[in-house]
């Protein structure tokens, strides 16, 4: 089926009862609410585009009062001929205060995960210390201290 067109794979009746949708963007991005019912689209840095994003957490990582982004992803569930989405190892993006985001090197951020992340969740312990839990597909979650 790899060399066939979509018209050769499906009969006309399938198309007649199908809902057609169009994607305007194929990159990882944020939509910024302008407050008047409109949104401004902003692509995320190129390092984020290396793999899919499956989990995002908004936290002020560096204590400057602006929400930064922590992201993780990967998808290993594709058929072998399509390969895996596994080129990123998690992303930390620091907010410059004007919604400009700068990617942080893994050594600087301390956030490096080769696994297939399905969800990110931040939480505090009873003393108020912040942590990030990464839910890993078919594995134990990983927990990172955010205040160290």
Q: Which residues does each predicted region cover?
A:
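Beta-propeller-forming repeat regions
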Residues: 1-148
């Amino acid at each position: 089926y790899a060399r066939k067109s979509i018209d050769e794979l499906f009969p006309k009746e399938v198309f007649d009862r199908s809902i057609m949708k169009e994607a305007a963007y194929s990159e990882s991005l944020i939509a910024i609410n302008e407050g008047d019912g409109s949104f401004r689209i902003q692509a995320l840095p190129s390092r984020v585009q290396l793999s899919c994003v499956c989990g995002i957490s908004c936290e002020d990582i560096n204590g400057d009062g602006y929400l930064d982004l922590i992201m993780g992803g990967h998808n290993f569930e594709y058929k072998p001929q399509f390969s895996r989405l596994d080129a990123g190892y998690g992303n930390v993006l620091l907010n410059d205060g004007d919604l400009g985001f700068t990617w942080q090197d893994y050594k600087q951020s301390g956030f490096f995960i080769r696994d297939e992340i399905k969800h990110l969740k931040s939480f505090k312990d009873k003393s108020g210390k912040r942590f990030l839990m990464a839910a890993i597909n078919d594995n134990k979650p990983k927990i990172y201290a955010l205040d160290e």
